[in-house]
């Protein structure tokens, strides 16, 4: 898969003292280096065998990833994020609460999936609130495209899941079409369409505010055959 168009733009944003502390002091405890020579062995990287590994692509400030890791200590979580403020925030939280079942990689998700994730190694992939690139001329920048999903399917084991969530209805329709068109997947909703928010996905403060204002959120959960 050759994807030259990035689904994100790196902007120079403010980093708080706590976030910088996370990057400077504790990132090395959690980071998987992209420049290692071979695909990762998750049993080695997490220090345990037989644990399911779930990847979150674009974890933002890490709120959902942190909560899910804390609630599911039996699972491994690998977070992929390019924005340093979010990485620092998550790492600081992980250190403060001594969470040990999370690793992070600070790199482009497409590159990571192509070269570092073994095939059939993941229990699931979650992509929560990816950039909708709502202007039509920018739709080509959207992360979730057919080629990208085809690559994800190879990395997920049979019965593994892809869970997407978005608060942009047009993007939800696009994601539904892309996932429904992939023959290796089936919709967890037997009647098709969108899923209720699974209890496993934490409700963010942003989402709670949106609900009060009447804004919609669409969850999509597809399973690999």
Curated annotation (Swiss-Prot):
One of its GO terms (cellular component) is tRNA methyltransferase complex. Pathway: tRNA modification; N(7)-methylguanine-tRNA biosynthesis. GO terms for molecular function: tRNA (guanine(46)-N7)-methyltransferase activity. Its EC number is 2.1.1.33. It catalyses: guanosine(46) in tRNA + S-adenosyl-L-methionine = N(7)-methylguanosine(46) in tRNA + S-adenosyl-L-homocysteine. Substrate binds at residues 135, 167, 204-207. The keyword Amino-acid biosynthesis does not apply. It comes from the Bacteria. It is an enzyme of class 2 (transferase). S-adenosyl-L-methionine binds at residues 56, 81, 108, 131. Keywords: Methyltransferase, S-adenosyl-L-methionine, Transferase, tRNA processing. The active site is at 131. NCBIfam families: tRNA (guanosine(46)-N7)-methyltransferase TrmB. Belongs to the class I-like SAM-binding methyltransferase superfamily. TrmB family. Catalyzes the formation of N(7)-methylguanine at position 46 (m7G46) in tRNA. HAMAP family: tRNA_methyltr_TrmB. This is tRNA (guanine-N(7)-)-methyltransferase. It comes from Legionella pneumophila (strain Corby). The gene is trmB.
